[in-house]
């Protein structure tokens, strides 16, 4: 799924894995080729290191990447990623090896090594997941997606899952989703979603429904809501994209008002929350944003949070 980390309920993990198994096979081929080009490793060498990792985790129960590398010298070898690119860097072999084992469901990431904001995690052996037929898994995942993000277009679901166009259309059809007209074209909504709208009296009923008035939200970077659709114009001014996303398409912290993104926020090292509005939402919104900022600051208390993927605007608010 776009080689992005998703957190899902344990009972949904088998379907997620089966729905993306083709991509996992491609990831293994790509990782093996990358290690071969950078370090001269072949499939046999990769398998030996993977076996050593699994044996170490079985012995210890759980371990961080650094702990595994201290025990398995091969994991300390370094390779150049994206050679010749502006973002070229060096990384330990432990990163692609552990990532591949996790993608294949052979190990799982557990609790962080420190507080909940720590970027260092322990790894542990994973129990085998039950097999789900790929077509059934894709249908289940598409239904889950539409429940959370519908109505959505074919392009939205294809982008979110990383599936082919054929697989995306097939999964949508199997859900029984019904076509609805959206500003950006044809969208799809589950039958129960259409029934809910009809029960409220259609679009006019939605506008007047209890709790449907203007509301403010401060969402963290990479929150699944702004990353839920390929087409974003209905909740994000295209002119604001550059200020809110990094060059790889990762979104920073966002401020929402009345269902649209209107700015960003960041935590200063002293704990104070700064924000920047990209448009003037009016006095009511500014008052609500100040109140929500105070609430979020109180919630974070002494915790300091730094996004993994920084945007220039968010970074400027921390100085």
Predicted region positions:
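Long, low-complexity intrinsically disordered regions
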Residues: 1-226, 230-232, 237-319
């Amino acid at each position: 799924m776009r080689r992005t980390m998703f957190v899902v309920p344990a009972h949904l993990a088998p379907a997620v894995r089966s729905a993306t198994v083709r991509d996992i096979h491609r990831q293994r081929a790509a990782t093996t080729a990358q290690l071969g080009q950078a370090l001269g490793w072949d499939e046999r060498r990769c398998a030996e290191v993977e076996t050593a990792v699994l044996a170490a985790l079985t012995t210890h129960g759980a371990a961080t990447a650094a702990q595994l590398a201290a025990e398995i010298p091969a994991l300390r070898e370094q390779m150049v990623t994206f050679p010749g690119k502006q973002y070229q860097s060096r990384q330990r072999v432990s990163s692609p090896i552990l990532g591949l084992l996790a993608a294949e469901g052979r190990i799982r990431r557990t609790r962080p090594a420190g507080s909940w904001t720590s970027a260092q995690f322990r790894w542990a052996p994973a129990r085998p997941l039950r097999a789900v037929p790929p077509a059934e898994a894709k249908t289940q995942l598409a239904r889950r997606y539409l429940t959370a993000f519908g109505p959505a277009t074919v392009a939205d679901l294809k982008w979110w899952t990383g599936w082919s166009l054929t697989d995306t259309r097939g999964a949508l059809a199997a859900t029984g989703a019904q076509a609805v007209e959206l500003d950006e074209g044809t969208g799809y909504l589950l039958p129960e979603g259409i029934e809910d709208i009809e029960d409220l009296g259609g679009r006019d009923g939605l506008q007047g429904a209890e709790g449907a008035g203007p509301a403010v939200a401060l969402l963290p970077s990479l929150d699944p809501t702004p990353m839920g659709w390929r087409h974003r114009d209905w909740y994000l001014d295209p002119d604001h994209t550059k200020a809110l996303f990094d060059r790889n398409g990762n979104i920073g912290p966002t401020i929402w008002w009345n269902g649209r993104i209107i700015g960003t926020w960041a935590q200063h090292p002293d704990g104070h929350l700064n924000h920047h509005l990209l448009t003037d939402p009016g006095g009511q919104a500014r008052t609500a944003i100040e109140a929500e900022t105070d609430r979020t600051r109180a919630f974070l208390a002494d915790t300091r949070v730094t996004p993994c993927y920084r945007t220039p605007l968010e970074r400027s608010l921390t100085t």
